[in-house]
């Protein structure tokens, strides 16, 4: 009889405790004292002596407990995080080599600096910006063995500005993104100026170049003083943490550049529409590739802007889902596998967001690498016009000499540094926007 009474009391106690737990979902998160050293998986126990200091270096405590969120965050599953990081490795590596090839091609290492135009300088800055941003975000060839440790130095700790690797990669990433964005906008304006045949002085172009780089430096190093660089929940690299800094130092400039790009595209299309069919055909043949690239990158920038705006507006919703999952973990601490996290950020949308910048490396290769102009730059370079080539590959050398002789006898001169290629008197010697030999389209 006594044993039955004890069983009944134990059963009643269990039911009573469960009732308390379910009647106050935030009970554990907001004040429950857990047994020392205990946190239900995948949460991590942090034995802290200075809670605020631990928060400052990247630990994300759950309520008043000593449990911290795992790193990477619970927004995605570990498998989904691996997919995004592996994508950054594969797509980033391909784009990296593509961009290195293009930068070498259009740099003084291969391309004669006398042939430089506004457009040449613009695309070099664009290529360099994309390369810098892409090689400092996500997973790279040289840190495969680090896994998540690059951005999660300790279990449950998100890297912060105090971690030197995080600070360096964040600065380069921000610098690369802003550089690529501002010069993309500049190229879109330059394309319209070229079609309108507006003359831009070399001095004005140099002033603009200096101003753009000063703005880039300010937007990059401004947040350092407020210790704003770090690894956050939905990112795959260190970047700006607080919303107001993200908006002020990046997304506001993005919005401005998108407006500039959109206006430029409308003006370009208007100019092409207003000319005769014969001139229109020539303009399209000459400018179609850069125009397509500008529009394609505009689409990607707009997608990234919309995705960021949407996820930011749903931030509280995502927080509530994570909180419900954490409460479930505490309630079912003995069997946490029964807890399933609800839908937060769309894995596919998040995947494509980070893929966009890596696609840009492949896109510029398609529009600027696989062209006649790229081949001409290499064939005219020192690398194909030296004693070794003349000795062992005389056919290539004689072909280059013949083309050079024809250009000289034709009386052509190279366009000035401040001019874009289509404004110069020499379409073959300067960098074509479209990579198409302009002389073949002259009436």
From Swiss-Prot:
Induction: Down-regulated by P.aeruginosa, PAO1 strain and PA14 strain infection. It comes from the Eukaryota. Glycans are attached at residue 47. The chain crosses the membrane at residues 84-104, 121-141, 167-187, 204-224, 249-269, 290-310, 351-371. Residues 105-120, 188-203, 270-289, 372-443 are cytoplasmic. Its main location: membrane. It is found in: Membrane. The keyword Isomerase does not apply. InterPro entries: GPCR_Fz/Smo-like. Residues 1-23 form the signal peptide. Residues 24-83, 142-166, 225-248, 311-350 are extracellular. Belongs to the G-protein coupled receptor Fz/Smo family. GO terms for cellular component: membrane. It comes from Dictyostelium discoideum. Keywords: Glycoprotein, Membrane, Receptor, Signal, Transmembrane, Transmembrane helix. This is Frizzled/smoothened-like sans CRD protein E. Residues 397-410, 419-432 have a biased composition (Low complexity).
């Amino acid at each position: 009889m006594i044993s039955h009474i004890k069983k009944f009391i134990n059963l009643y106690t269990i039911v009573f405790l469960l009732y308390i737990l379910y009647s106050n979902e935030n009970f554990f998160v907001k004040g429950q004292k857990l047994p020392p050293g205990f946190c239900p998986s995948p949460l991590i126990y942090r034995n802290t002596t200075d809670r605020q200091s631990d928060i400052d270096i990247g630990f994300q405590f759950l309520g008043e407990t000593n449990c911290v969120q795992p790193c990477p965050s619970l927004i995605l599953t570990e498998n989904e995080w691996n997919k995004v990081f592996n994508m950054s490795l594969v797509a980033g590596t391909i784009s990296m080599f593509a961009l290195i090839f293009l930068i070498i091609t259009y740099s003084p290492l291969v391309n004669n600096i006398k042939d430089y135009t506004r457009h040449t300088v613009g695309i070099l800055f664009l290529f360099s910006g994309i390369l810098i941003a892409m090689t400092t975000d996500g997973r790279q060839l040289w840190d495969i063995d680090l896994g998540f440790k690059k951005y999660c130095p300790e279990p449950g700790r998100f890297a912060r500005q105090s971690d030197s690797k995080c600070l360096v990669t964040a600065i380069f990433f921000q610098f690369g993104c802003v550089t690529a964005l501002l010069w993309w906008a500049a190229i879109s304006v330059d394309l319209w100026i070229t079609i309108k045949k507006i003359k831009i002085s070399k001095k004005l172009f140099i002033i603009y170049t200096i101003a753009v780089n000063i703005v880039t430096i300010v937007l990059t190093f401004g947040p350092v003083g407020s210790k704003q660089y770090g690894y956050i929940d939905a990112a795959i690299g260190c970047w700006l943490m607080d919303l107001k800094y993200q908006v002020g130092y990046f997304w506001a400039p993005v919005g401005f550049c998108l407006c500039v790009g959109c206006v430029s595209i409308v003006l370009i299309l208007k100019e092409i529409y207003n000319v005769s069919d014969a001139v229109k055909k020539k303009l399209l043949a000459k400018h179609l590739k850069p125009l397509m690239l500008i529009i394609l990158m505009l689409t990607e920038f707009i997608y990234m802007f919309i995705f960021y705006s949407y996820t930011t507006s749903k931030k509280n919703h995502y927080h509530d889902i994570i909180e419900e999952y954490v409460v479930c973990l505490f309630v079912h601490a003995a069997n946490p596998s029964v807890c399933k996290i609800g839908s937060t950020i769309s894995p596919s949308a998040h995947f494509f967001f980070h893929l966009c910048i890596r696609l840009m490396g492949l896109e510029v290769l398609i529009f600027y690498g696989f062209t006649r102009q790229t081949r001409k730059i290499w064939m005219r370079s020192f690398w194909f016009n030296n004693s070794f080539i003349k000795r062992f590959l005389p056919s290539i050398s004689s072909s280059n000499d013949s083309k050079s002789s024809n250009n000289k006898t034709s009386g052509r001169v190279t366009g000035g540094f401040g001019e874009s290629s289509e404004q110069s008197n020499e379409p073959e010697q300067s960098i074509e926007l479209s990579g198409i030999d302009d002389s073949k389209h002259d009436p």
